[in-house]
C-alpha cells in the first residue's frame, strides 16, 4: 500500500489552523493528518460529522465550534489565534444542492465573504485556501487546465447554483490577495472519494448498495466519465498549497487523471472488489449532469510538486474496507 507519511506535507507543524466545514469528509482527513503536530479549530454546523468515526472529536489538539459561516461573529471568534485558514464549508452533494439552491449560494457567497473579511481584518494570516469545485468547467471538461475558460449551465438549472457560487468565491479570493494582500489560493477538487464519505457521492452510494446486496443504481446508461481521486491525495495537495509560497494567487486542479472510468464501469468495479451479489440497475436522471470530467494537473505538479499516488483499485479497496467496518454501526 502507498504510504503518504513520507510526502512533503510533513513540514506543516506548530501551526494553529481554522478549518471551516472541518467535520466533513475531506475536513476530517485533513484534521487526522494535521492534529498530531498542530492546533486545529473546526467551525462546522455538524449537519454531517465524520470526526466521530475517525476518533477525532475528543482529540486534545482539536477544538470544535458548532456554528455557521453565515454568522460573521462566530467566524471572527473561530479565527482567533489562527495563522492559516482552510475554507471547506459549503452545501455538499448534488441531491442536496438541487433541493436547496438558495441556501447553496448563500453559504458559498456570504459564508466566503465572511471568512475573507474576517481574515483580512484580523491580519497575520499566512495562507487562506478557498475550496472551489471542478463543476466550474461545466458539462464537458477533458484535460482542462486552470487557464481554460470556465463554463456554466443554463440559468434555472439548480445544479449550477453550486458552480456559479464557487466560481464567484474564486474571484473573491484572488482579489482579496490583489487588493488587500491576503495570501489566498483556490483548490478545484475532481471527484474525491474515500473512507468517511458519508451522505452522498457515487462511490458512497455504490459501495453501500453493493455491501448490502442491493441493486447498484446508475443514472441513465452510465457512460458519464470521471477521473476519481482518493482523499489522501487531495489532502497532500491542500497541504502543499498551504506551505508553498508559489501557491498564492492561483487556482489549482487537484485530481487523478490516471484513474479515469465511466460511472457504469465504476459500479462494476465496486461490485467486483466487494465480492457482491448486486446487479446494476439503470435509473432515469433528467437533471443536468456532467458528461465528461478529467483534469489537467500540470500546474499543480509544477508549482506545488503535487503528484497523486493512489490508483483506483487500491483506493476503492481501502474505501470498501472502511465501509465494511462502519456500515450500519450505531
Can you say where each PLM-predicted feature lies in the sequence?
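N-terminal Rossmann-like NAD(P)+-binding domain of SDR-like oxidoreductases, especially those catalyzing
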Residues: 1-188
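C-terminal substrate-binding subdomain of Rossmann-fold SDR/epimerase-dehydratase oxidoreductases
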Residues: 10, 210-330
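Generic structural signal for alpha-helix termini and adjacent loop/cap motifs
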Residues: 29, 49, 100, 118, ...
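Solvent-exposed, non-membrane alpha-helical residues enriched in polar/charged side chains
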Residues: 67-70, 76, 116, 174, ...
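Residues in well-ordered alpha-helical elements
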Residues: 73-76, 83, 95, 102, ...
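Short-chain dehydrogenase/reductase
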Residues: 97, 190-191, 251-254
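NAD(P)-dependent short-chain dehydrogenase/reductase
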Residues: 140-149, 167, 171-242, 257-258, ...
Amino acid at each position: 500500500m502507498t504510504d503518504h507519511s513520507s510526502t512533503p506535507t510533513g513540514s506543516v507543524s506548530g501551526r494553529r489552523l481554522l478549518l471551516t466545514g472541518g467535520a466533513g469528509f475531506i475536513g476530517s482527513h485533513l484534521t487526522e493528518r494535521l492534529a498530531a503536530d498542530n492546533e486545529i479549530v473546526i467551525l462546522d454546523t455538524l449537519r454531517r460529522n465524520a470526526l466521530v468515526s475517525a476518533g477525532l472529536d475528543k482529540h486534545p489538539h482539536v477544538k470544535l465550534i458548532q456554528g455557521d459561516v453565515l454568522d460573521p461573529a462566530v467566524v471572527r471568534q473561530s479565527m482567533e489565534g489562527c495563522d492559516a485558514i482552510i475554507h471547506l464549508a459549503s452545501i455538499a452533494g448534488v441531491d442536496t444542492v438541487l433541493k436547496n439552491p438558495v441556501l447553496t449560494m448563500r453559504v458559498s457567497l456570504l459564508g466566503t465573504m465572511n471568512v475573507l473579511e474576517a481574515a483580512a481584518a484580523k491580519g497575520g494570516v499566512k495562507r487562506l485556501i478557498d475550496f472551489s469545485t471542478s463543476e466550474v468547467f461545466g458539462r464537458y471538461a477533458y484535460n482542462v487546465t486552470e487557464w481554460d475558460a470556465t463554463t456554466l449551465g443554463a440559468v434555472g438549472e439548480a445544479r449550477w447554483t453550486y458552480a456559479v457560487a464557487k466560481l464567484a468565491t474564486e474571484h473573491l479570493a484572488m482579489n482579496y490577495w490583489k487588493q488587500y494582500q491576503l495570501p489566498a489560493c483556490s483548490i478545484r477538487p475532481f471527484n474525491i472519494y474515500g473512507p468517511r464519505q458519508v451522505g452522498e457521492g457515487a462511490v458512497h452510494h455504490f459501495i453501500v448498495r453493493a455491501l448490502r446486496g442491493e441493486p447498484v443504481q446508475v443514472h441513465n446508461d452510465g457512460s458519464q466519465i470521471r477521473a476519481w481521486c482518493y482523499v489522501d491525495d487531495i489532502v497532500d495537495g491542500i497541504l502543499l498549497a498551504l506551505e508553498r509560497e508559489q501557491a498564492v494567487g492561483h487556482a489549482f486542479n487537484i485530481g487523478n487523471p490516471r484513474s479515469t472510468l465511466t460511472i457504469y464501469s465504476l459500479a462494476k468495479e465496486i461490485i467486483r472488489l466487494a465480492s457482491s451479489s448486486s446487479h446494476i440497475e439503470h435509473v432515469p436522471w433528467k437533471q443536468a449532469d456532467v458528461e465528461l470530467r478529467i483534469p489537467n494537473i500540470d500546474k499543480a505538479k509544477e508549482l506545488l510538486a503535487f503528484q497523486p499516488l493512489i490508483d483506483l483499485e487500491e483506493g476503492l479497496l481501502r474505501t470498501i474496507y472502511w465501509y465494511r467496518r462502519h456500515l450500519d454501526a450505531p
